[in-house]
């Protein structure tokens, strides 16, 4: 875990033909109805002038509370019967698919029945944990901070400033929420780990081992690609834990582990949802030139359903780690994404992200921020003061005891769950005259 990010915190069928991979999943049961800030990579950046793999990566050794191998033997033993059943139920299918006139790699999980929803979970501090559901099949994007941290005994995972203590984390909260809302080990279609920061994928291994996603997506990561030493934290440790769990999933029940995508041409048909993966650096230039922050290696997701859309922007930044030097990522992503109805703000709504041209291009009518109003720049929510946009900063929503904000997609549009018990305000210093807005 890392402090700057942490607390700002079946039936399955798979086949590959002509570059098209198609998977199908039918759930065993329909989904149940939905009813502080500490800092790691989200801290104000330090003056950098003053600062000093793939699926074959080795599993980390045990350290402190959790390591990649924890629970593997127990999971193998307790789940062996279920794995055999899953293997018996797997059936292969294939079809040629085109999305928008472009050949695409499409994973299909048709489901049976049930609502189409995006759940953005409240977390401790600022972190991303987003549950998708449609027709009784589910997907999980990220999973917030987990319990455990490297203890420094393994030279691959040294103790570093800014790593969240091992006792802090939302493991029980996230796993419990998923179970409560109907996720089982037979109906989780895919897991997407957007990038190797602990406030996003620290619980990836727990989610994979408990809920057995049929496809696991996550970009490759290595500490050697990070040029800013202050941006390393426990990235490699949490990434290696996820990779070890993904390898276990491949061996145990035949999961697919996908770490490379072809531009913006990877889609998942999840019930009535189309989920399009949006890599921030499609050419993976960081593998050659390096990059200052793992955020810049990330993958976002555009969701379309019933003629409405959402962009889940992970930690998309338009700057390098200094939060000053612009990199053009938002312009490139905006061209790929286009206008959306709902935006999960990039990088928790911090000032490295969501610049005016990006907000104008996406033009969302709802902004969900996995962070706090207290550090929100005016540009993220400028339209809120004119009454044109719904805004939910999840730190304030969570402080009101609300477990999530749920967006329900239907032929009538998008409706949002009630979070009126939460309250906050914002001062718009860039407005003339100065403006205040209160909820």
Where are these regions (language model features)?
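N-terminal secretory signal peptides that target proteins for export/translocation
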Residues: 1-8
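Bacterial N-terminal signal peptides
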Residues: 13-24
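Sec-dependent signal peptide cleavage junction
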Residues: 26-37
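Asp/Glu-rich intrinsically disordered low-complexity tracts
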Residues: 38, 42, 47, 54-56, ...
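Core dinuclear metal-dependent hydrolase active-site scaffold
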Residues: 95-187, 259-342, 406-439
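Metallo-beta-lactamase
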Residues: 187-199, 343-347
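Active-site HxH/HxHxD metal-binding segment of metal-dependent hydrolases
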Residues: 189-190, 198-248, 364, 370-372
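Long, structured stretches of catalytic cores involved in phosphate-ester chemistry, encompassing
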Residues: 322, 328-405
């Amino acid at each position: 875990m890392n402090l700057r990010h942490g607390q700002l915190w079946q039936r399955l069928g798979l086949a590959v033909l002509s570059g098209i991979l198609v998977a199908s999943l039918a759930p065993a049961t329909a989904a149940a109805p939905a009813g502080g800030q500490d800092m790691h990579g989200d801290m104000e950046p330090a003056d950098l002038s003053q600062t000093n793999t793939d699926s074959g990566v080795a599993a980390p050794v045990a350290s402190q509370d959790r390591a990649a191998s924890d629970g593997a033997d127990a999971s193998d033993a307790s789940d062996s019967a279920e794995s055999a059943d899953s293997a018996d139920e797997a059936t292969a299918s294939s079809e040629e698919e085109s999305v928008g006139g472009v050949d695409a790699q499409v994973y299909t999980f048709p489901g049976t029945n049930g609502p189409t929803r995006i759940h953005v979970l409240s977390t401790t501090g600022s972190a991303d944990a987003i549950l998708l559901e449609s027709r009784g099949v589910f997907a999980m994007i990220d999973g917030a901070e987990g319990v455990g941290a490297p203890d420094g005994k393994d030279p691959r995972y040294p103790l570093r400033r800014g790593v969240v203590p091992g006792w802090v984390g939302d493991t029980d909260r996230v796993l419990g929420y998923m179970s409560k809302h109907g996720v089982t080990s037979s109906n989780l279609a895919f897991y997407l780990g957007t990038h190797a920061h602990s406030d996003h994928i620290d619980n990836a291994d727990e989610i994979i081992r408990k809920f057995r996603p049929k496809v696991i997506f996550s970009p490759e990561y290595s500490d050697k690609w990070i040029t800013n030493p202050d941006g390393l934290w426990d990235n490699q440790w949490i990434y290696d834990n996820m990779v070890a769990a993904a390898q276990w999933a491949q061996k145990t029940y035949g999961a697919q582990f996908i770490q490379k995508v072809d531009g913006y041409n990877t889609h998942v048909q999840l019930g009535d949802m189309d989920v399009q993966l949006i890599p921030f650096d499609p050419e993976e230039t960081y593998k050659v030139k390096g990059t200052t922050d793992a955020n810049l290696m990330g993958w976002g997701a555009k969701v379309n359903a019933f003629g409405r859309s959402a962009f889940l922007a992970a930690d998309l930044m338009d700057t390098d780690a200094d939060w000053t030097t612009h990199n053009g990522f938002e312009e490139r992503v905006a061209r790929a994404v286009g206008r959306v109805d709902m935006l999960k703000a990039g990088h928790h709504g911090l000032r490295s992200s969501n610049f005016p041209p990006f907000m104008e291009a996406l033009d969302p009518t709802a902004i969900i921020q996995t962070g706090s109003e207290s550090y929100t720049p005016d540009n993220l929510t400028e339209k809120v003061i004119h009454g044109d946009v719904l805004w939910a900063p999840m730190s304030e929503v969570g402080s009101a005891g609300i477990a999530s904000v749920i967006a329900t997609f239907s032929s009538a549009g998008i409706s949002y769950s009630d979070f009126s018990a939460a309250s906050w305000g914002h001062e718009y210093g860039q407005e003339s005259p100065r403006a205040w807005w209160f909820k």
